[in-house]
Amino acid sequence: MAGKSDPEEKIIKAALRLAAKQGWTGLALADIAKSARVSLPALSKHFFSKTRILAAYGRRIDAEVLQAAADETLSGEAARDRLFDVLMLRFDALAPAKAALKRIAADLRRDPLAAAPLARPMLQSMSWMLEAAGIDSSGIGGALRVRGLALVWAAAFRVWLDDGEDQSKTMAELDKRLRQGEEFLNGISRFNARRRSTFQKDAAQA
């Protein structure tokens, strides 16, 4: 994350610190400003909602994971293995805020309207995770991969919230979900290949 003088970082850290203690639903922006030792008008220059604070935190996690992945040697691995490694790096990056994230996740499950605006930032994060693993996230195929990975991540994240330090359950869930996702995408690819072949044959006979 950025340096100590970064007001956004102070606000994000304050929000997570308070969320770990008192949950997310009842947490006011004024409380966050007070904990961050910034005025409410100063906070408003950076964030106009708690959702925006979480989205900014997510972007910082994205950047941290992208840097960590760049420092790793992933190019020789299979695509699924690269994705596994990248997502585990993401869990490592999230670990310091695990207590806060557990409270936030529990509150957002009970408040779908509050959770809804986070869907788009999450898809963007998953797009970056694919790119970090050397997998294209553009076009129709990329959009399918992004949405599929979001489902994989959501399932593994739920397990991670209650997992121990060894993260064995998280790794098992992540591996299982990635294999399922790979099989699904391979099935789509085979189906599309058959459609193209049939179309080409019909066109040749016309």
Q: For each predicted feature, which ranges?
A:
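Short, basic, alpha-helical segments at the C-terminal edge of helix-turn-helix-like DNA-binding modules
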Residues: 59-66, 73
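Amphipathic alpha-helical interaction segments
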Residues: 10, 31, 85, 89, ...
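Short, hydrophobic secondary-structure boundary micro-motifs
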Residues: 102-104, 117, 138
